[in-house]
């Protein structure tokens, strides 16, 4: 941190007192999740109130306030809370998929530790119980949560094997899930490049035919495909997806932002495949939310 923690806390206090949402967002965007947590701890020690409570008292509520509050919460605690919320009542399957795929092994294990202690149940078991085991996407999620990967050994053979799985008259959901859940990212990117070279289409495009009858299956495998190319690549794809509805998907964009904005530069680069992130955020979200999102992701309006 180039500024002292005391200076940052003072700047934050001023922004909160002035209800300056963009300044709060800008300060949050300047620091990593671990650094934000240290700042939050110092803020509470200095001003005798949690920064999250200070923001809630100052701002006028709504999703934008929630987003700014959650920027100052431990990402492991926040993900655990989001997973618990997604599993409650009628399960939010879209949220479950985002939270499972948009997470590296280390963060997953840390989140599980927080979840297991806070909610007194095993996170992986809770997710599996909520989504069942019959659908293709549920099988993929179950395997993915294991975070057990190893080199498969032969890229050329794996390309042929994957093509056979995709082209089979009846999709073998167990085998397909096992392939995606156990292949290392380094080897998968080689497989993906070779697959595209051999068959003149990407793996995610090839998966449309066997999975097109169920949008959830297709979305899950697309997420797995992009995640294996790097979480910023998946974040870009999910941001683009959140920008497709006329008024944007606020719940989704907030989940993605709080969990992935630390990797904004890589995500911005990956987003070029879809267009201009700043312009899309401005087009899809309201005049309060859009500037906050652009600030956090460090993108400008077109």
Swiss-Prot record:
GO annotation, biological process: cytoskeleton organization
InterPro entries per record: Alpha_giardin, Annexin_repeat, Annexin_sf
Transmembrane segment boundaries: none
Protein family membership: Belongs to the annexin family. Giardin subunit alpha subfamily.
Subcellular location: Cytoplasm, Cytoskeleton
Function: Giardins are involved in parasite attachment to the intestinal mucosa and in the cytoskeletal disassembly and reassembly that marks the transition from infectious trophozoite to transmissible cyst. They may interact with other cytoskeletal proteins such as microtubules in the microribbons or crossbridges, to maintain the integrity of the ventral disk.
Entry keyword set: Annexin, Cytoplasm, Cytoskeleton, Microtubule, Repeat
Taxonomic placement: Eukaryota, Metamonada, Diplomonadida, Hexamitidae, Giardiinae
Domain of life from the UniProt record: Eukaryota
Start and stop residues of the Annexin repeats: 1-72, 74-144, 153-226, 230-298
Name used for this protein in its record: Giardin subunit alpha-5
One MF annotation (Gene Ontology) recorded for this entry: calcium-dependent phospholipid binding
SUPFAM superfamilies found in the cross-reference section: Annexin
Pfam families (UniProt xref): Annexin, ANXE1_4th
GO CC annotation, single: microtubule
